[in-house]
Curated annotation (Swiss-Prot):
Keywords: Cytoplasm, Transferase. It is found in: Cytoplasm. It comes from Flaveria bidentis. This is Flavonol 3-sulfotransferase. GO terms for molecular function: sulfotransferase activity. Highest in shoot tips and lowest in mature leaves and roots. One of its GO terms (cellular component) is cytoplasm. Its EC number is 2.8.2.-. It is an enzyme of class 2 (transferase). Belongs to the sulfotransferase 1 family. The active site is at 119 (proton acceptor). 3'-phosphoadenylyl sulfate binds at residues 59-64, 141, 149, 207, 277-279.
């Protein structure tokens, strides 16, 4: 596998001072660990019709979606005072296809069909995931906020200050399609086009709509993944309790998410706090110049205008 990766086109990100390298495989850019996971899943993963995928482009609301899905499916075992989310960060509650293949396969053998998260492009999903009619939840977000969140996440991982990591260079690379799991627009287009062919197995959630009024989206999510709320639960405020438990304010205040590590056993473990920066929409306005805004808006219209998805 490493021998194959060595032969691929590669790009060292200039805004990260060459501390982060991406490899291009089948027209998609990925860092080495995700690429290895993709190749391995292509070879060994077999989807089950009961599997549910939580798909997203990185920094589009993945952490929040995972927390909500986990709280929804485990609410009969735990409430908002006993949930594992109080002591375990969301990424450790829902397995990632790119990194947790053995755990996912073990769950399948034990008939434990918990949601599976992924940042794969639709075309990069193992064939069985695309043909077995698994349900797919796709969360998407304003492209400008994605760029800002992506920029801060990576620069903090490689330990660079804002002054050391030029934001305009990050924007330029992103607009060239060079980003982890990029190009961004191809990621969205793949899932959107697939949803036109099989609308019954897709649920699209918009981050900004969820922030504005989370109740309808949480109800849709619960219905879609097969764990609908009963009228009694709705009257008892269970939906609101789950939303509060999974809120940025709650999760970011927990000790595990302030001082813990994600995958501490690995050489490239990440501080949990890096997954909780601001948790709001519109922060891009503090970073983008008028020229950058014009550039991004033109790109969105050109690449994604036909989808009808509001991404700017």
């Amino acid at each position: 596998m490493e021998d194959i990766i060595k032969t691929l086109p590669q790009h060292t990100c200039s805004f990260l001072k060459q501390r982060f390298t991406l490899y291009k495989y089948q027209d998609v850019w990925n860092h080495q660990e995700f690429l290895e996971g993709r190749m391995l899943s292509e070879q060994t993963f077999k989807a089950h019709p009961n599997d549910v995928f939580l798909a997203s482009y990185p920094k589009s609301g993945t952490t929040w979606l995972k927390a909500l899905a986990f709280a929804i499916i485990t609410r009969e075992k735990f409430d908002d005072s006993t949930s594992p989310l109080l002591t375990t960060m969301p990424h450790d509650c829902i397995p990632l296809l790119e990194k947790d293949l053995e755990k996912i396969q073990e769950n399948q053998r034990n008939s434990l069909y918990t949601p599976i998260s992924t940042h794969f492009h639709y075309k990069s999903l193992p064939e069985s995931a695309r043909t077995s009619n698994c349900k797919i939840v796709y969360i998407y977000r304003n492209m400008k906020d994605v760029i800002v969140s992506y920029y801060h996440f990576l620069r903090q991982i490689v330990k660079l200050s804002v002054e050391e990591a030029p934001f305009e260079e990050a924007v330029d690379e992103f607009c060239q399609g060079i980003s982890s799991c990029g190009p961004y627009w191809e990621h969205i287009l793949g899932y959107w086009k697939a949803s036109l062919e099989k609308p019954e197995i897709f649920l699209f959630l918009k981050y900004e709509d969820m922030k504005k009024d989370p109740v309808p989206s949480v109800k849709k999510l619960a219905d879609f993944i097969g764990h609908p709320f009963t009228p009694k639960e709705e009257e008892a405020g269970v939906i609101e309790n789950i939303i509060k438990l999974c809120s940025f304010e709650k999760l970011s205040s927990l000790e595990v998410n302030k001082s813990g590590m994600h995958r501490p056993e690995e050489a490239h473990s990440i501080e949990n706090r890096l997954y909780f920066r601001k948790g709001k929409d519109g922060d891009w306005k503090n970073y983008f110049t008028d020229e950058m805004i014009e550039k991004i808006d033109k790109l969105i219209d050109e690449k994604l205008g036909a989808t009808g998805l509001v991404l700017k």
